[in-house]
Swiss-Prot record:
Superkingdom, taxonomy of origin: Bacteria
Pfam families xrefs: AAA, AAA_2, ClpB_D2-small
UniProt-recorded name of the protein: ATP-dependent protease ATPase subunit HslU
Gene: hslU
Subunit structure: A double ring-shaped homohexamer of HslV is capped on each side by a ring-shaped HslU homohexamer. The assembly of the HslU/HslV complex is dependent on binding of ATP.
Binding site for ATP: I17, G59, V60, G61, K62, T63, E64, D251, E317, R389
This protein's UniProt keywords: ATP-binding, Chaperone, Cytoplasm, Nucleotide-binding, Stress response
Length: 439
């Protein structure tokens, strides 16, 4: 999608309140990708993305900015926590697995696009598979009259299948099953091994299962995709997308920084994780299920609160790989008020729509919204600052009784006013000890 930086920021304004500096920097970084692709191949190789370091408390919009943009522009995107990785030689996930995760995200993205383009062919394949079970093909040598009867019965059955009239009927189908897909107890570091065995086919077998037709339609989608879609071209496109459009969002980067003033209490493997991360951010070749993936042009966005450490506590080489830095603003009561009212699918709209399913019309008057924002802001100031996430806790507590008794208000309109907010939350916010547990 070809959008100018101004258009990108305008799109983000519908979902993320404030944070103009962060939006501007990311918009420019994404536009530079488009600009790079317009150049000669020789020059493209020399232009590497300027990685971004976002500094700010939790809940201020760091992840949301990157996630929204990636989804809107159709870019492969993954979010990982730096603190979940371990140095090579230690038990746990190694940093290369984040690149394999990005490859999987790109593969799923391209597969879904191709499935949508070939939806009619896939639906027809699934229909024919199910119809074969419902009405087995006639043997050879059958009279023309019998063949015509069979054809008519088949079309009637096809119509019923498409209309959903047979959804509750049960059939037995044969589907492929991989032993790794069905074992939830495998450790995450087995990811590479899973990729290998899937490629060579070890551990895969056909199993027969009885299920309702509506479930069989979903179960046969993968098989339909494997048969109809060109798997090699999908892998090739996914590799290209991951290399040139991929975004890896590394959260909690501050958790692997080694504070100089408190070095004796640090985990010695933290610096090791940084050093393992360095070649990936600099550019290296990683083996994945879709081929060898070059990380040179992946955009890395690192983020952290940096309450107990500073960006300068990261190793110098890694600092140099994140040249663009932006500090995100904390959210005051005015910003929280805008978060409750401005976004397309604001939190208040979500709650109203949820209760609408109970035939209850829920409204918030303006003074009530301002009071909710003030209480959330005060809770953030007096306790740990968790940004906009505090609004979820405050509104859940405010609407707890109404949600529980929603059926009693069916067919009615319920207006939340300032008085109700004060009655439900006033005593809690005044009692600091109680507020720490509830809000």
């Amino acid at each position: 999608m070809n959008l100018t930086p101004k258009e990108i920021v305008k799109f983000l304004d519908d979902y993320v309140i404030g944070q103009k500096k962060a939006k501007k920097i990311i918009a420019i970084a994404l536009r530079n990708r488009y600009r790079r692709m317009q150049l000669s191949p020789e020059l493209q190789d020399d232009i590497v993305p300027k990685n971004i370091l976002m500094i700010g408390s939790t809940g201020v919009g760091k992840t949301e900015i990157a996630r929204r943009l990636a989804k809107m522009m159709g870019f492969p995107f993954i979010k990982i926590e730096a603190s979940k990785y371990t140095e090579v030689g230690f038990v746990g996930r190694d940093v290369e697995s984040m690149v394999r995760d990005l490859a999987n995200a790109a593969l799923n993205l391209v597969k879904n696009e191709q499935r949508e383009k070939n939806k009619d062919k896939i639906d027809e394949f699934i229909e024919n598979k199910i119809l074969e079970k419902l009405l087995p093909p006639l043997p050879k040598g059958i009279s023309d009259e019998k063949q015509e009867e069979y054809k008519n019965s088949l079309e009637k059955m096809r119509t019923k299948l498409r209309n959903g009239d047979l959804d509750e009927s049960t059939i037995e189908i044969e589907i492929s099953q991989n032993m790794f897909d069905t074992n939830p107890n495998l450790p995450p570091e087995m990811g590479a091994m899973q990729d290998i065995v899937k490629v060579i086919g070890v551990g895969s077998k056909k199993v027969k299962k009885e299920m309702k037709i509506k479930d069989a339609k979903n179960a046969l989608k993968n098989e339909a995709g494997e048969k109809i879609l060109d798997q090699e071209s999908i892998k090739s496109e996914a590799l290209k997308r991951a290399e040139n459009e991929g975004i890896i969002f590394i959260d909690e980067i501050d958790k692997i920084a080694v504070s100089s003033g408190n070095s004796n209490r640090q985990d010695p493997s933290k610096e090791g994780v940084q050093r393992d991360l360095l070649p990936i951010v600099e550019g290296s070749n990683i083996q994945t299920k879709i081929g060898t993936l070059k990380t040179d042009h992946i955009l890395f966005i690192a983020a952290g609160a940096f309450h107990l450490s500073k960006p300068s506590d990261l190793i110098p080489e890694l600092q140099g790989r994140f040249p663009l830095r932006v500090e995100l603003d904390s959210l005051d009561d005015k910003a929280l008020y805008e978060i409750l009212t401005r976004p397309k699918n604001s939190l208040l709209k979500q709650y109203s729509q949820l209760l609408k399913t109970e035939n209850l019309e829920l409204e918030f008057d303006d003074e009530a919204i301002k009071e909710i924002a003030k209480i959330a802001s005060r809770a953030n100031e007096e306790m740990q600052d968790i940004g906009a996430r505090r609004l979820h806790t405050v509104i859940e507590k405010l609407l707890e009784d109404l949600s529980f008794e929603a059926d009693e208000y069916a067919g009615k309109k319920f207006v939340v006013d300032k008085k109700m907010v004060e009655e439900k939350l006033g005593d809690i916010i005044e009692n600091k000890d109680l507020a720490r547990y509830i809000l």
